[in-house]
């Protein structure tokens, strides 16, 4: 995923995301549109332009294919839109498929900066982070959407990322934990990270932990998909640092952080699918890759110039 680095014509492209199979690429930009490309080998072909937002589109996110071909988008206009690809009848004279806007959520009173789908094991859940200070969680069940919305960060929420559905250590423990967890982390303009846990009895998301350390806005957060013995959260900040927060399965409420320093404001952090390599991108259009060594220190393994 990239954010705020490429120009498509005269408009700044804010985000890009590949679908689960790597066959479709969605991009979004300041021109209020979302573009869908088909990827074939080294080539890509524009197949659809989606129009529906009334402001710059900041974020696009594909749902897991078990829920269908579904894309979520969020914008400066305060809206979250859900798009679905409908395949034409095989006997139809019009071949191919069409994209339709199936839901239009106007829950927020300011820009929605990021949307993030939960691990598919938890259900069809979308978490949304807004400059109005609130987080909303949308859930699709039985052909209808329900939502929850709650206050998260006083000065606005910039980013959001779900924890893996299985708790750390559950794969290698003889006594696995209580099944699927619904948990995510948010990053705010109050310089804080906050971890939220779902309570199935009250059916609410409750603040379980606040992580302090950054001295400026937290621009992005990313929870590692790894479910071995530790949990990792990476955070990128306006303070020119990335922090990697670690919690051991033996002491799950305890988080320690390691700071990585950079020469530029940082925009984005992203884990590899296995959760052991971290990509960091910032204002200098460079991407660096980081890995933990055997001593538990994070080392840069590669620089990629865009």
UniProtKB/Swiss-Prot annotation:
GO terms for biological process: COPII-coated vesicle budding; ERAD pathway; mRNA transport; nuclear pore localization; positive regulation of DNA-templated transcription; positive regulation of ER to Golgi vesicle-mediated transport; positive regulation of protein exit from endoplasmic reticulum; positive regulation of TOR signaling. Keywords: Cytoplasmic vesicle, Endoplasmic reticulum, ER-Golgi transport, Membrane, mRNA transport, Nuclear pore complex, Nucleus, Protein transport, Repeat, Translocation, Transport, WD repeat. The keyword Transmembrane helix does not apply. It is found in: Cytoplasmic vesicle, COPII-coated vesicle membrane; Endoplasmic reticulum membrane; Nucleus, Nuclear pore complex. It holds the Pfam family WD40. It is a peripheral membrane protein. One of its GO terms (molecular function) is structural molecule activity. The keyword Nucleus applies. InterPro entries: G-protein_beta_WD-40_rep, Sec13/Seh1_fam, WD40/YVTN_repeat-like_dom_sf, WD40_repeat_dom_sf, WD40_rpt. WD repeats lie at residues 2-47, 52-93, 107-148, 152-206, 213-255, 261-300. Disulfide bonds: none annotated. One of its GO terms (cellular component) is COPII vesicle coat. The COPII coat is composed of at least 5 proteins: the sec23/24 complex, the sec13/31 complex, and the protein sar1. Component of the nuclear pore complex (NPC). NPC constitutes the exclusive means of nucleocytoplasmic transport. NPCs allow the passive diffusion of ions and small molecules and the active, nuclear transport receptor-mediated bidirectional transport of macromolecules such as proteins, RNAs, ribonucleoparticles (RNPs), and ribosomal subunits across the nuclear envelope. Due to its 8-fold rotational symmetry, all subunits are present with 8 copies or multiples thereof. Belongs to the WD repeat SEC13 family. Component of the coat protein complex II (COPII) which promotes the formation of transport vesicles from the endoplasmic reticulum (ER). The coat has two main functions, the physical deformation of the endoplasmic reticulum membrane into vesicles and the selection of cargo molecules. It also functions as a component of the nuclear pore complex (NPC). NPC components, collectively referred to as nucleoporins (NUPs), can play the role of both NPC structural components and of docking or interaction partners for transiently associated nuclear transport factors. This is Protein transport protein sec13. It comes from Aspergillus fumigatus (strain ATCC MYA-4609 / CBS 101355 / FGSC A1100 / Af293) (Neosartorya fumigata). The gene is sec13.
């Amino acid at each position: 995923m990239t954010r705020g680095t490429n120009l498509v014509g005269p408009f700044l492209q804010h985000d890009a995301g590949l679908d689960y199979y790597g066959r479709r690429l969605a991009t979004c930009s300041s021109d209020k549109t979302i573009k869908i490309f088909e990827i074939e080998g080294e080539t890509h072909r524009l197949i659809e332009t989606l129009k529906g937002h009334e402001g710059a589109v900041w974020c696009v996110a594909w749902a897991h294919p078990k829920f269908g071909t579904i894309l979520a988008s969020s914008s400066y206009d305060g809206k979250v839109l859900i798009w679905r690809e409908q395949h034409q009848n095989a006997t139809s004279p019009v071949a191919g498929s069409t994209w339709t806007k199936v839901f239009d959520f106007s829950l927020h009173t300011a820009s929605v900066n990021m949307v993030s789908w939960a691990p598919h094991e938890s259900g069809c859940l979308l978490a949304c982070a807004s400059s109005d200070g609130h987080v909303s969680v949308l859930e699709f069940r039985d052909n209808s959407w329900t939502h929850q919305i709650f206050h998260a960060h006083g000065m606005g929420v910039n980013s959001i990322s779900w924890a893996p559905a299985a708790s750390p250590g559950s794969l290698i423990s003889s006594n696995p934990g209580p099944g699927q967890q619904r948990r995510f982390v948010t990053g705010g303009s109050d310089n804080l990270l906050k971890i939220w846990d779902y309570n199935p009895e009250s059916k609410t998301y409750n603040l379980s932990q606040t992580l302090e350390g950054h001295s400026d806005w937290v621009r992005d957060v990313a929870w590692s998909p790894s479910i071995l013995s530790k949990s990792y959260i990476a955070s990128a900040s306006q303070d020119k640092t990335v922090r990697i927060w670690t919690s051991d399965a033996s002491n799950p409420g305890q988080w320690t952080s390691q700071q990585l320093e950079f020469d530029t404001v940082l925009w984005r952090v992203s884990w590899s699918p296995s959760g052991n390599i971290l990509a960091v991108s910032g204002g200098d259009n460079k991407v660096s890759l980081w890995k933990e060594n055997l001593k538990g220190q994070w080392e840069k393994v590669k620089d990629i110039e865009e």
